Amino acid sequence: MDAFLETSLTASKYVLIILSVCIIVRCIRSMLSERYESEVWAYIRLGREILPVNHWENIIGRSRGADIRVDQPGVGRVHAVLKRSDRGIWTIYDVFSRGGVWVNGTKVGSRGINLETGDVINLAGTCVRFQDITTEKREKLESARTSAGKRVSPFMTLFELTVFQLFLLLQHAISAHANHLPNIVLGFVLLIILEWTCYNAMRLMSRSGFEAETLAFYLTTLGMSVAASSTPADMFKQILLTIAAVLLFLLCGAWLRNLKRTAMMRDPVAVLALLLLAVNVLASDAVFGARNWLELGGYSFQPSELVKAAYIYVGASTLDRLYRKRNLFGFIAFSAVCVIALALIGDFGTALIFFVSFLVISFMRSGSIATVFLAVTGAGLAGFLAISVKPYIAQRFASWGHVWEDVYGAGFQQTRAMSAAASGGLFGKGAGSGWLKDIFAANTDMVFAVICEEQGLIIAICMVLAVLTLAFFAVRSARHGRSAYYSIAACAAMSMLMVQMGLNVFGSLDILPFTGVTFPFVSRGGSSLLSCWMLLAFIKGADTRRDASFVVRPVRKIEEYHVGYDAETDDYDYGDDGTEEDEP
């Protein structure tokens, strides 16, 4: 019997590796290798040249990076913003241009001017004509685009993931104690039901792009395996948190579908995030030098994890708000308060993640390398000050690169992590068969090493590739997002997950200082899991492939323009007095 179990365990290792590679390769093929076909919403006619309008928010200017490039004398690098509302109403705004913007002879003021088909737009002497497209034309263009999942079936990829989960469950059935086996089986069965329920819900919505969710479920499965190895008695709690995380992902995605509603709630979300951090600063107790945990009804959670999603929600911006100084200064102030609060509670790993996201958002807002350089310089000085006043942080930096010199002190965790990772080899020891899981914080801060030990280096690399695939997909999708809000949010969300992964992997291997941050979707912890699934909703918001994302509204009939309609026109002030002037 023992020989049969040993043979089954060995065979399952190879099957898991093959399935992992297949899942990652199929997702890469579907998300990154297929040609991205942009949406077309209108046209701008410049003489005989016809320029497609591919987004709901477009920069018009002379810059090479402009969405609608008009390379003519007098036209500024960033001259105007052309925006489409959720109701199909197009509005043009003047963005600090020197030559001004006129529509049919009327100067564009601070509130912008609504456009209709055939309107002539004067950009500092260069005239272009706006041409909206009919519903029939739009539907024809949309039907010509390739549907997501047509070349690589999401059903087969999810089926492979299900087989992967069953073989992983087999390994736990071999290694787990009999008392814990029912909890482990229940956890994996409910996870399989959850992912197929989510898939079928998307199919009912005529959505065929399920690659990002599949990668998230793949990572969550590995996290479930770590929980089954380290804390099998808490498996039911872990699956409940997973269900809550997926539901929160669906709710966030549904909320993001309405861009105007999303933008209107940025200030309330910012206030809520600051209140959470304030409670964290005032009410939490220090644990190993940090005060980042709150106790509520017998359960502990990290407010900073939930604030991650709020930070991106507040930091992203639509194009018409992007150039407002008040909006930019407000975001900088919000970022400063968040980082200071994280410093006060001693969560410098999360503070670093926030800072990198701040750099990404700042660069996408301004496009200025100088701004990023100044921010990095200021952060370097702040980091030096933190090391000076926080002894436990200084100790971590002192042991960085020297953990083998103090294997029973400052280097205790990293030396064990590296030893366990090396002992797993390429194929691992099998789920639940390692010893690192018994070390403090192994299932959170050193989870990469736990996967290396139990599942082998190949699956650990697949785990990293899953996050990298999401990252490249987010950047690729951002170029085609309907709104700058979705593009900025997707890139910022992915920067958080990337930095989080890098700090976890390289920190546990002593390549970077050990900061104690979690691996996205994999590390045990409800707060982290909730946060990661919420961030995934931002990535889905930028995915404009045909029938791909439930966050993106399908192409539908545009309602008729309303004479004097004002509710959809945003009352933004760009510095001029809004008075009419004669056309040049």
Which stretches of residues belong to each language-model region?
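Intrinsically disordered, low-complexity acidic Ser/Thr-rich regulatory segments
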Residues: 1-72, 86, 135-144
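Hydrophobic alpha-helical transmembrane segments
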Residues: 17, 189-194, 242-245, 453-474
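Forkhead-associated
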Residues: 51-127
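A structural signal for hydrophobic alpha-helical transmembrane segments in multi-pass membrane proteins
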Residues: 143-288, 530-556
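Hydrophobic, glycine- and aromatic-enriched re-entrant/interface helices and adjoining loop segments
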Residues: 287, 291-293, 300, 373-463, ...
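Loop-to-helix entry and N-terminal half of a specific, functionally important transmembrane alpha helix
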Residues: 475-516, 522
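A juxtamembrane structural motif centered on a specific transmembrane helix
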Residues: 504-584
